[in-house]
Amino acid sequence: MFNDLISKFEIRDSILILIPHEVVDDELLILISHGSGGPGEAETAMSNFFLSHGYTVGIVDYFTKHNVKKLFWSDRPEYKDAYEATFNEMFDIAIPNYKKVVHIGFSLGGTLGLVNSTKFTKNYCFYPGTVGMTQELLDQDYSNTTVIIAQNDIWCSDYREFASQCKSPPRKWVAKDCYHGFMIPGKEKTIPIVKYVTTENVLSWGQFNTLGPNHEVLKSYFDYTWLTIKLLYNEKECIMYMNKILKECQSL
């Protein structure tokens, strides 16, 4: 998958570190976090892009050590998420020791980015979900963070309410005429999901710490409804945002 682009790789905790043949900045790490399906095509494409430009890349897998395979966000018995791990446990990753860490997260990986934003030099969150709000998260300084919203994404619409209540909200880029998953090469499908209403109440930190990919837990805190979500790759926008992030990395 990456053999032609890397000189070696390392595994640190739950992060696969990929080192290109010629490193342009040995102080900088591009750290990439996956969404509900685990590491896949979006993470591979982003990794290949930055490796080809000489950047060391780390791919986070925050599922495997918690025995999470894939999240369905469903209340149907055969697809209902019922994992014991909490989001905080899953998102508690050991950041590799680089002077500059640029995080790029997709969907739930974008949520990981919001929760951990203070740990990064730059933080780019593509169509992040909002799994719950606390006053601590609302008070956090997101001046290093950019959220990329897909214009036609109805799954992650709660993020807008979250951002409106932040004291120092992230910068916002809007991907025109795009849907959830527009960074996933070849993706074109619709999926039924449960959408939890996560921005009506501000939770205590203790309450937030109990949240996880478990329908019974989430419905005890949040009302929910049913939606059919469209996921659609947009090659033009995908390439444009890769290049925008690259340009900002080159100035660090």
Labelled PLM ranges:
Residues 10-19, 29-95:
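Serine-hydrolase catalytic machinery in alpha/beta-hydrolase-like enzymes
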Residues 170-252:
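C-terminal catalytic histidine-bearing segment of alpha/beta-hydrolase fold enzymes
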Residues 147-149:
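Short beta-strand/loop motif that positions the catalytic acidic residue
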Residues 139-145, 168-169:
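Short, proline-enriched alpha-helix->beta-strand connector loops that line the catalytic pocket
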Residues 87-142:
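Primarily recognizes the serine-hydrolase "nucleophile elbow" in alpha/beta-hydrolase
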Residues 154-161:
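Conserved alpha/beta-hydrolase "acid-adjacent" motif
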Residues 21-29, 140-142:
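Proline/glycine-enriched tight loop/beta-turn segments at coil->beta junctions
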